[in-house]
């Protein structure tokens, strides 16, 4: 897999990425896709040992964060399969990068 570097300089984007990866199931999903390549939901759920509905929730969160992509395809027998693949990424999170990202947060601090 070719790695690309995405700059997570926007505060909201950085929060979405960190939140998406802060769950052990989602980390396992990214790992399975990174190692095994693109896969469809049913097979991926079996591979990592969680239910399809739960996997759908985690894939949605990962897709919203831009860490995975999906593509609906027809199988040989005419069934629609939703394939997921990991988006190549590399992030370097430094204190300076966090400070810059914090300047662009849209959420107001709680008082």
Specify the residue positions occupied by each region the protein language model found.
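Key DNA-contact positions within bacterial/archaeal DNA-binding proteins
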Residues: 53
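Short, hydrophobic-biased segments on the C-terminal half of alpha helices
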Residues: 59-60
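Long, low-complexity, charged/polar intrinsically disordered regions in eukaryotic proteins
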Residues: 1-12
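N-terminal helix-turn-helix DNA-binding core of bacterial DNA-binding proteins
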Residues: 13-50, 73-76, 80-85
């Amino acid at each position: 897999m070719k790695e690309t570097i995405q700059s997570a300089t926007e505060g909201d984007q950085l929060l979405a990425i960190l939140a998406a990866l802060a769950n052990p199931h989602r980390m396992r999903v990214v790992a399975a896709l990174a190692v095994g390549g693109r896969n469809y939901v049913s097979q991926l759920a079996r591979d990592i040992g969680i239910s399809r509905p739960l996997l759908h929730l985690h894939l949605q969160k990962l897709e919203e964060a831009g860490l995975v992509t999906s593509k609906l395809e027809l199988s040989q027998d005419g069934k629609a399969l939703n394939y997921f693949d990991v988006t190549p990424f590399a992030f370097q999170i430094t204190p300076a990068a966090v400070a810059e990202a914090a300047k662009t947060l849209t959420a107001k601090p709680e008082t």
